[in-house]
Amino acid sequence: MSDSFFKDIPEFLETRVNESLDARSKSIAQFKELGPPDQVNTIKVNAKNPSKEVGTYHFVSGVDASSSASLAAYLNTLSYSLDKSQQWFGKGNAWRVSHGVYCCYNVFSQVDVRVEAKIPGGVDTYAIDENGQKHIVDARMWTEAYMSEVLRSLLYSDDTNSRFAGHRRFNPIPNPDAELRFFEAAEQLFTLGYTLGSSSEVRVPTHVNNHLVRGIFAYLKQTCRYSAALNLFEKLRVSIPEVSVLLAELYLLMDHEVHAVRILHDSLLKQRMSASLLIVQVKFLISKERYDLALICAKRAVHASPSEFATWACLADVYLHLEDFKSALLALNSCPMYTYYERDAYPLPPSARAHLPFPVNFPKEELEVENNAQNGYTVSTEITDPYLARLPSPSLRGTFAKAYEMLTLICAKIGWDELLRVRSAVFVMEEEYRSLNDITEGNASPDQNEVAEESVAEEVVGLDKPETSVGSLPKNATVQSKRLCERWLDNLFMVLYEDLRVFTIWRAEYTHFKSQGLAYRKAPAEWEILGEVAFRLHHRVEAVEAFCACLESMFSFKAWKTLLIIYSEDNNIELVLTAIAKLTLYNYRWYQEYSPFLLEQMKNRIMQDGALKMKSILASTRLDPYILNLIHKLYFEWAIAFQIPGHEL
């Protein structure tokens, strides 16, 4: 059966032919976001026994979905891969692809566009809706399918929540011709952008705040090719005045601050209560350290859109820069929290067998303990402290993750003890509540369910556990100057306490062992968790220490990615390139040729240091020639195609 698999393409063997296709069809009505990745199903028959057929499937992103011809071409390439596989095993053509189906979800029309190819034979194209009905695919629907595919690639390729095995990822915009097609499609579909939804931090999607706009700016940050977007926004601004805010953001990205300020000024004269314009203005003023003016604009933004998370978070950020931590906590407490929706997925029947081959000539030795580091998550064979594994902070998503990040910034600035003091100064604590209850006659004691959850924990190196705030007050309460702390913020204080507790114990143990002249040892997975904790708490030196200790014993995608962020901020080009090389190789092993994060990092280095210097440094690192060729193919050739400044070799 091994000779029926493709040589270098991941596959899952179906127990029953097309069962995964049926599962996708039944789940179309459940897709709420941009949709799942494209699914490719193939049926293979045995030349010696034509009645014997097997069904396989895999997932793919970044394929040109602008026409049936381009998708049929992808299906056709699979036949060549099967031929190579059989030649590789030194066998005749025992198996051949007889049938292939390419599925691409069109998020605009909410249908699954499918190209069905018989090999040899014709190509059939149709769309399936949530009721299983077939529809004709017209030119408009192809444009929508193309844009849906590109947006999924731009926005989800680096999302660890949507990564799973058997998923090939290609660059959706590999050359200037593809870029032109992208912006032409964006112009046609711009007015429908709000129907796609937006990030988890936005309550109501608008023309200027949606997944389509997010995708455009994600692409611009990768390439810095602003001219096409500039023309697009100038054209759209005539009929959609709100687009002015996108134009201002674009000019700020281009470092054309005078143009940006002029647009903001003119637009705010016409749209005085535009929260989007005011937020851009606030961020600009913060960058210029004019926090007094930023505060005025942030307050206006809150008045303009009090139900949006972004406006309150913006106000809290300004207070943080002003070091008015009481007001920052109050603004944070006022942030509306939204439910986080996971990326679209659907239940698949268990596969009979999985085929996840290494790329040809892949240097396996470069990824130490590779089997313990699949799909971005490391699993150590050593026993990990169960308390570390149960930390709640890694599970935070959306607005809760953003609010927690702001809370950690406040804590990093003033310390845990001062944070507790500020908290008790602005919020009513449980002790005060009980005192009020004792004074107020006829009031029943508060229900224990109304008090934030609290567990008894050991006292840790002088780290005080946060006192619980209350969820309601007696009607005749006399504490007029304090607010009620929202339950979610109360919980975030407990989450922060857990992180601080782990960090404090770790550093205390480390100091003790060092003073005794003893080696401090942890399991690799424990080092990885400790590094994440330190990074969340903005202790960069300790984070680097933990991640490096982790990498001494095992490969960790998380560790290398976080180290890349830190090394980039420190402008350490040698370590940046080493991290990029490791992450690129790991991604390539799992069929990912496109990473917006790595592409942007590489673009920044090319623009700053030049491709020639980077190639010289890479050559001196003694990396395997396979990795050097891979970096040249994925990054340097891309930079040449797009004429990125500094691309000359």
Swiss-Prot record:
The disulfides recorded in the entry are none
Q: Which domain of life does the protein's organism represent?
A: Eukaryota
Which keywords does this chain's UniProt record carry? Cytoplasm, Nucleus
GO CC annotation, single: cytoplasm
GO terms for biological process, alphabetical: Golgi to plasma membrane protein transport; Golgi to plasma membrane transport; Golgi to vacuole transport; intracellular calcium ion homeostasis
Q: Which InterPro entries match?
A: ChAPs, TPR-like_helical_dom_sf
Protein location? Nucleus; Cytoplasm
Q: Which PANTHER family match?
A: BUD SITE SELECTION PROTEIN 7-RELATED
What name does UniProt use for this protein?
Uncharacterized protein C31F10.16
Species name for this entry? Schizosaccharomyces pombe (strain 972 / ATCC 24843)
